[in-house]
């Protein structure tokens, strides 16, 4: 059994090494420009960030550089993921490789951009000013960056749902009917996932869950277009059965 899995494990190791190597190279490049990236990250917050420990500045630079490296490396990561999956697919299923890489990377960037320009400014402003009449908001640079990266990467991953639906529908694993049937269960799962990948506050979870519900609806439409239910065939079969029944009745008469 292990001998059968060995080639797959070796292939997985190869793809992981390429992905990790890409992230590492991107990290080194981003670390050189971490101050510029930090200014971009801080642009959504007009307040002052503080440093609570001597090592905090280094940790902030590492966090920012690593997060930026992941975003930059997404096309390569999707490409390596596809190269690992592709050998187990049929020839016609492999035709989705370019849409998978292109739309996978694109939807990740759209999710990150949606979080940066729409969600994050509102959430940070709300949380920073909540209770401002009782205490002063002194946000550390490290906690701010952690909050920012978790939200940005979380939305980037969440926006992959339509891409996943397209891929699964293309290989025939799901249909729009199956997604509709599990809709109420999906809502529960969506709120659980939102609670896991977002910072621990209700506002962030709601802002994550609502777009996910919309993306689930979009996934239903995508599955319907890619792998539609064979209604025409069913209607044709019903008509044929009716015609056969009528012919049999006439013959008996």
Swiss-Prot record:
Segments passing through the bilayer: 18-38, 69-89, 96-116, 151-171, 187-207, 208-228
Gene Ontology molecular function: any one: proton motive force dependent protein transmembrane transporter activity
Membrane topology: Multi-pass membrane protein
Residue ranges of the region described as Disordered: 231-253
Keywords: Cell inner membrane, Cell membrane, Membrane, Protein transport, Translocation, Transmembrane, Transmembrane helix, Transport
Basic and acidic residues biased stretches: 244-253
GO biological process: one example: protein transport by the Tat complex
Superkingdom to which the source organism belongs: Bacteria
Subcellular location: Cell inner membrane
Main location per the UniProt record: membrane
One Pfam family named in its UniProt record: TatC
One GO cellular component term noted in the UniProt record for this chain: TAT protein transport complex
InterPro entries the record matches: Sec-indep_translocase_CS, TatC
Entry's family note: Belongs to the TatC family.
Cross-referenced PANTHER family: SEC-INDEPENDENT PROTEIN TRANSLOCASE PROTEIN TATC, SEC-INDEPENDENT PROTEIN TRANSLOCASE PROTEIN TATC, CHLOROPLASTIC-RELATED
Summary of the function given for this chain in its UniProt record: Part of the twin-arginine translocation (Tat) system that transports large folded proteins containing a characteristic twin-arginine motif in their signal peptide across membranes. Together with TatB, TatC is part of a receptor directly interacting with Tat signal peptides.
Subunit architecture: The Tat system comprises two distinct complexes: a TatABC complex, containing multiple copies of TatA, TatB and TatC subunits, and a separate TatA complex, containing only TatA subunits. Substrates initially bind to the TatABC complex, which probably triggers association of the separate TatA complex to form the active translocon.
Name assigned to this protein: Sec-independent protein translocase protein TatC
Recorded name of the encoding gene: tatC
């Amino acid at each position: 059994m292990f001998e059968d899995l060995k080639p797959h494990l070796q292939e997985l190791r190869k793809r992981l090494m390429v992905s990790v190597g890409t992230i590492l190279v991107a990290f080194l490049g981003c670390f050189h420009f971490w101050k510029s990236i930090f200014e971009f990250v801080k642009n959504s917050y007009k307040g002052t960030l503080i440093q609570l420990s001597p090592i905090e500045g280094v940790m902030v630079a590492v966090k920012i550089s690593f997060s930026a490296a992941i975003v930059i490396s997404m096309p390569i990561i999707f490409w390596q993921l596809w190269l690992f999956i592709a050998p187990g697919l049929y020839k016609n299923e492999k035709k989705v490789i370019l849409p998978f890489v292109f739309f996978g990377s694109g939807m990740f960037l759209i999710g990150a951009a949606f979080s940066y320009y729409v969600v994050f400014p509102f959430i940070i402003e709300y949380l920073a000013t909540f209770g401002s009449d009782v205490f002063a908001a002194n946000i550390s640079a490290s906690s701010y960056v952690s909050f920012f990266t978790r939200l940005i990467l979380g939305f980037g991953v969440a926006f992959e749902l339509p891409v996943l639906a397209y891929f699964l529908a293309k290989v025939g694993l799901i249909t729009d009917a199956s997604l509709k049937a599990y809709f109420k269960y999906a809502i529960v799962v969506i709120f659980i996932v939102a609670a896991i990948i977002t910072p621990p506050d209700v506002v962030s979870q709601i802002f994550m869950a609502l777009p996910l519900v919309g993306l689930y609806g979009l996934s239903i439409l995508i599955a319907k277009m890619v792998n539609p239910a064979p209604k025409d065939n069913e209607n044709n079969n019903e008509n044929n059965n009716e015609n056969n029944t009528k012919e049999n009745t006439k013959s008996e008469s």
